[in-house]
Structures are given as C-alpha cells and as structure tokens.
C-alpha cells in the first residue's frame, strides 16, 4: 500500500506539472462531446411544445454546444425501448409527444432533423442508445401515456427482467439480443449517423432472478455464482460483438462505442483493475460488463468511462483512474465521461475542476477526448466553468481523432482556393471541392479551414485550425478576422472518419498590392559584363502587410546593352499580391569598331613590286583598344601593326580583334591576294590576251622595267590560267 501511495503521489506531481501545459496547447484532434438526454426530458424535448418549438429548442442546444467548442453531439434516441424517430419496431417516445406511441403532429422526424442540424454545425452525430432499459420505474408502468400498447412491456412481458424498480430486457434471452440488434441496425441502415453509442445500462445493481433464461441456455457455464456471473457477462458480450459485426458489414464508417461507469474493477494489481476503493461500484461485477474484453477484442471503437469523481477524491480519485484507463486503451480510442452535473457540489467547488480534468486527459497519450454529462449543466454554467471552457480550454476548434482501424484512405484535395473581402471585414473563402470517389469511405463530408500568420503553416499545430465546415459546402466566412490584421488560409477535405486530404493552395486576406517605387541605376561594364540586384533600382517600395520579395526582369548586362535599358522591378507582398514598375539602367562602356589599313599596296606580286605589306588596325569608336591578330602565322605582329611577307601565292585573310577597356570585343577582317609572277632569272611573268579563239592568251617573261608598259596594254601579272 505504501508503494501504491508513493506511485499515486508521483502521478499527481507529474499530472500537476503537465496537464496545465497541455491545457494551454489543445490538441488539433480531440473528441469534445456532449450528452443530450431525452429521458425525462432532462435536456430536450419539452413534450408539451409544438414540433416547431421543439426544433427551435434543439437548434439552440446545438448552437450552444458549437459555441462551447464541441465537435460531437450524443443525442439519446432510445431511452426505454422507445423511439425519438419513426420506427416500426418501437413506439414513439412519451417525452416527445406526451403520449407514447403517438406520432408528432404535424409529422416530423426528430432524428433526421438532429442529424442534419448537427452536421450543419460541423459536428458529428452519435445516436445514444439505452440497450436494455425498458421500464425506468415500475411505479408508473401501468400509465398508458408512458407505456403504450405496442411497448415491449405490453407485447413481450416475458422478455423483461425486474431488478428493484427497474425492468430491463433480459440480456440472457436470444430473442432480446435479436430485437435490440434489429433496433440498432434499423437506425444504422435508415439514418446517416456517425456513431452508435451505448450508455452504462446493462444489468442493474440488485437481486437478479434470471434462472429461467440461464436454464434454457447455459452455454456450458457452470451453475455456480462465478459461472452465473460469467454467463451474464457473456450475454452482454454476445450483443456487443454482434452489433459491432453488423455495423461493420452494413456501414463500416459508423463508429460504435460504449460509456460504462467509471470503474472496471478495483485492485492494487493494475493488470486486474484500478487503484480505487474495493467498495466502489465496479461494472465488471455489478453490471456484468467486461468492457476491457470488448476493447481488447476490437468489438468497440472506443470506451467512454464515466469518471465522475473529482481530482483527489478518496477511493475514486480522478487522477488515478485516468492513467489506468489510458493504459487499457488497446489501440482503440478512450474518451472520459465528465461529471459536469456535479459542479458547485461538495468537492466540486473549484471553477477549474472540469478544465483541470481535461488538462489531465490531454497529458495522457491514449486519452483521445471527453464527453460532458450533460447539456443542461453546460447551459447552467455553474461557477462559470463553461465560460472557462469556451474561452480557454476549447478556445480553438479540434477535429475528431481518426480511427485507422476503420480506414486510412483520405479524400482528394480541394483546389482553386480564393479569398475575397466580405461585409464587416469578414474574409470570404471559396474553393473547388474534390471529385467524390465512388467509395463511400473516401467521399468528402466536411472541410477543415486553417489560418496562420505564417505562409508555411503547420497543419498539425492546433492553433492554426480555424474551423470545420458543415457537410461539404465549398465556402466559409471567417468572421473572426481582426480589421487591419492579415492572415494566410488553406483548406483540406475530410471524409466520414475525419481523415484529411492534402492541403489546397494558400491565400490571404491581403488584397492590396505593393506600392512599387523605382530609381534609375548606372553601371560600368567590367570584362564585358555588369549586373544589378533589385535593391539597386528599388526607390522605397512598401506594402500594407510587408514586402516578401523583390525581383528584376533582368539582372545581367553585356556589351550589347551599352546605353539605356528598361528594367521592371516587381514586388511580391506577404499576401501573394504582385506589382511592378519600370526603371532605367544606364550601361556604360565602349564597343570597338576596328578597321584595318594595308600599305603600301593591297596585294603582293611575288617577283615584282613590294614583297612585304604592313597591316595597321585602328578603331573608329576611339576606344583605347587592345588588338590581337588571327591567324598569327605568317605575320609579324606587335599591337596594332602586323607585317605580312608571303612566300607563296594564294588569298590570305587576317582578322584583328579589338578589346575595349570595359572588355567589349569586335573584329575586322582583311583579305590580301598574293600572285606568283616569278619566271626566273629576275624576269616577271605576264599574260597577254590574244583575242584568238584557238589561242586566247599568251604568257611571256619580261624584265621588271618593261612590266608597266605591258600592263597598260591589258596584260596581267602572273601566269595565264587554263
């Protein structure tokens, strides 16, 4: 026991240090449910109201739940073998029409209405079922208004088991299991519910006389006290496993869970039970509900134990029970039922009690949320505890946690997200919904809206989740956007299991483009190139939210750009808006214009006249150019001057490249013909045109001093061609 107390103290210390922080950082995914009780009209409906008034009242309840920060409603639709919906199996509820079995007039279906209205507010709808209770109080059983002729207590009294002042459907009868399963599947098949939810009404506490049922179907359980207890637990097991199998086969996305009382078993051995008082009510033995087996076997998607004790309560301490349930989740969801109804009673006088319990839930990895009992007490707001939930604990919305064992396929992503400014500074978002899959599990049911002041927003950060829309409407109005403050938005699609798609594009509520101001820039080329940055031409660009980046239409310049150049400066602001303006960039430098002069002649005649030519490069642009000749073979070049002394006939082309001081290059080419007129013995070869068709030309060799006279007569230097 000493070790147990030390462990409890350690748990308290860890919890006290951690759950406050956890509370300040609410998770992105967390079930936040509210039980809405219809039995005795505890929360709804008022049986004397008109259908229109009842609808308005239910709408107000759902509005209140949504405003509190909830994401799931658990509406009691069958409290004592009756129906808050149109059923061929059980009569209309007394608490709806003031007469059991009488349909509402004018006709309406409260369950269908509740589903639609809950979904319209972006919440899940769970149909809350009392599986076995048939007559809540035998003192009123004879009242025909409460129990109509078609009620099971009238049609099949042999199915009932009386325990104290309560009558239940006998769990040991196969026909009872058939009936309850049929009722549940009637709801599942005809209504688009998100979940089926059982509460803790199994075998009630008290003397149970079920000998006849046991004797008729003992199924091998021995006729001992322990055997009878195991038989009763097996009766419940048979229904739980059957309902689970039936739901999975019909609509595998529908969630099935049970909310038992808060203590499974009491034991100092955690493998058996929780460290709670041996005298506390333990549903394993008092209600014959083996809930741990159900979750171990995967027969339920979640348990929601009603841990209706305050932190530090002797014998049934909240801070000792929650860790035990956390350790027994078996890879299913574990929610905690919270006792809102006890606020401002003995032990519950702290306005932070419920908020602290939620903080403790969040500090345990396998606790996936909580359900509040019940709506009227949230509405009553004792000690302003609901105000604290609304303003702090549930200030940011949360998505329901995913159930990977039910499915892992997410819907397609939304596209074409756009933002516009609505009335009163509201930000209107609209997008294109993804094309729905033929697979019901992948169809889009809702959208999650995210908002952040960071463009690269973290979708897993709970503070960035703004809302979950109703149904699959591809639009949303952010009425919480503060005037003068700017945000980024994106959207994801959610399927029935709240599995999330990839994100859409990101938009913002900044619709004002940047104010781009420019200045002119002047650049001097170096090595034939120069460059600028956006800052060189930015003359003080500004934006209402902030400039994210500046860019220029071109940043590099060459010798071809010498002179004035138009450049666009573009500014992208944080909201994704872009604007641009022109600037002039003056590029300084000189482009050479080389020319080549040849002297003393334009050609070389080997054997006659000058045998060496001088090629001289110059620049018409007046640049102080540097020159390079190509090809250099056969030239004696030094800077701008090159000497050409050929030794053979031919046509010789030479290129000179001029480079300015700024690294700009240009070329000029000259071609020098070389004629071979050498005849030997110092004579020069000439070709005379004879005019004869048989002998059109005649080659002669003459002395150099006679060449000019022959040239004047039409002779040409060199040998005759052909």
What residue ranges belong to the model's regions?
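Active-site neighborhood of glycoside hydrolase catalytic domains
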Residues: 179-183, 189-198, 202-276, 281-303, ...
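Substrate-binding cleft of secreted/luminal carbohydrate-active enzymes
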Residues: 288-292, 296-314, 330-406
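Proline-threonine-serine-rich low-complexity tracts
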Residues: 512-641, 646-714
């Amino acid at each position: 026991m000493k070790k147990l107390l030390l462990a409890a103290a350690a748990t308290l210390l860890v919890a006290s240090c951690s759950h406050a922080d956890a509370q300040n950082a609410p998770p992105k995914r967390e079930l936040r449910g509210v039980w809405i009780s219809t039995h005795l009209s505890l929360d709804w409906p008022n049986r004397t109201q008109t259908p229109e008034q009842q609808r308005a009242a239910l709408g107000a309840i759902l509005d209140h739940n949504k405003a509190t920060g909830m994401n799931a409603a658990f509406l009691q639709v069958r409290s004592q073998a009756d129906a808050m919906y149109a059923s061929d199996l059980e009569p209309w509820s007394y608490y709806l029409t003031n007469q059991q079995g009488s349909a509402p007039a004018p006709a309406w279906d409260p369950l269908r209405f509740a589903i639609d209205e809950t979904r319209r507010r972006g919440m899940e709808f769970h149909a809350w079922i009392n599986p076995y209770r048939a007559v809540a109080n035998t003192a009123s059983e004879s009242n025909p208004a409460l129990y109509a002729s078609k009620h099971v207590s009238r049609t099949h009294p042999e199915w009932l088991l009386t325990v104290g002042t309560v009558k239940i459907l006998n769990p040991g009868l196969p026909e009872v299991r058939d009936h309850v399963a049929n009722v549940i599947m009637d709801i599942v098949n005809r209504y688009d519910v998100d979940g089926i939810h059982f509460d803790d009404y199994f075998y009630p506490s008290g003397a149970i006389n079920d000998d006849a049922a046991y004797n008729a179907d003992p199924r091998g359980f021995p006729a001992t006290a322990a055997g009878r207890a195991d038989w009763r637990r097996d009766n419940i097991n048979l229904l739980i496993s059957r309902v689970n199998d039936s739901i999975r086969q019909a609509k595998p996305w529908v969630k099935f869970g049970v909310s038992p009382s808060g203590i499974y078993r009491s034991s100092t051995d955690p493998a058996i039970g929780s460290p709670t008082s041996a005298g506390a009510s333990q549903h394993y033995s008092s209600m014959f509900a083996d809930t741990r087996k159900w979750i171990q076997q995967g027969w339920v998607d979640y348990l929601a134990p009603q841990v209706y004790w305050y932190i530090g309560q002797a014998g049934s301490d909240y801070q000792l029970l929650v860790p035990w349930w956390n350790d027994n989740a078996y890879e299913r969801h574990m929610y905690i039922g919270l006792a809102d109804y006890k606020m401002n009673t003995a032990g519950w006088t702290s306005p932070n009690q419920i908020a602290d319990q939620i903080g403790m839930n969040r500090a345990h990895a396998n606790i996936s949320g909580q359900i509040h009992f019940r709506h009227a007490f949230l509405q009553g707001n004792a000690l302003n505890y609901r105000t604290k939930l609304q303003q702090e604990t549930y200030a940011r919305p949360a998505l329901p946690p995913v159930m990977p064992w039910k499915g892992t396929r997410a819907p397609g992503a939304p596209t074409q997200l756009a933002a516009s400014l609505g009335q009163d500074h509201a930000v209107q978002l609209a997008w294109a919904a993804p094309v729905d899959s033929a697979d019901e599990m992948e169809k889009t049911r809702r959208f999650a809206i995210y908002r952040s002041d960071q463009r690269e927003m973290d979708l897993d950060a709970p503070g960035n989740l703004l809302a979950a829309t109703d149904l699959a409407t591809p639009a949303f109005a952010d009425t919480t956007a503060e005037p003068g403050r700017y945000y980024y938005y994106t959207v994801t699609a959610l399927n029935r299991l709240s599995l999330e798609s990839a994100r859409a594009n990101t938009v913002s509520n900044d619709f004002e483009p940047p104010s781009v101001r420019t200045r002119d820039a002047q650049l001097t080329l170096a090595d034939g190139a120069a460059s600028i940055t956006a800052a060189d031409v930015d003359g003080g660009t500004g934006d209402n939210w902030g400039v994210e980046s500046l860019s220029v239409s071109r940043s590099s310049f060459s010798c071809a750009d010498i002179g004035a150049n138009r450049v666009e400066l573009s500014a992208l602001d944080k909201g994704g808006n872009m604007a641009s303006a022109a600037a002039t960039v003056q590029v300084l430098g000189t482009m050479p214009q080389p020319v080549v002069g040849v002297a003393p002649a334009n050609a070389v005649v080997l054997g006659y006249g000058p045998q060496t030519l001088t090629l001289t490069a110059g620049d018409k642009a007046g640049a102080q150019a540097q020159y390079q000749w190509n090809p250099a073979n056969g030239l004696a070049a030094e800077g701008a001057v090159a000497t050409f002394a050929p030794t053979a006939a031919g046509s010789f082309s030479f290129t000179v490249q001029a480079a300015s001081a700024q690294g700009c290059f240009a070329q000029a080419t000259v071609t020098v013909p070389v004629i071979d007129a050498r005849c030997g013995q110092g004579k020069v070869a000439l070709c005379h045109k004879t005019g004869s068709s048989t002998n059109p030309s005649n080659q002669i060799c003459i002395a150099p001093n006679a060449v000019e006279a022959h040239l004047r007569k039409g002779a040409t230097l060199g040998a005759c061609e052909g």
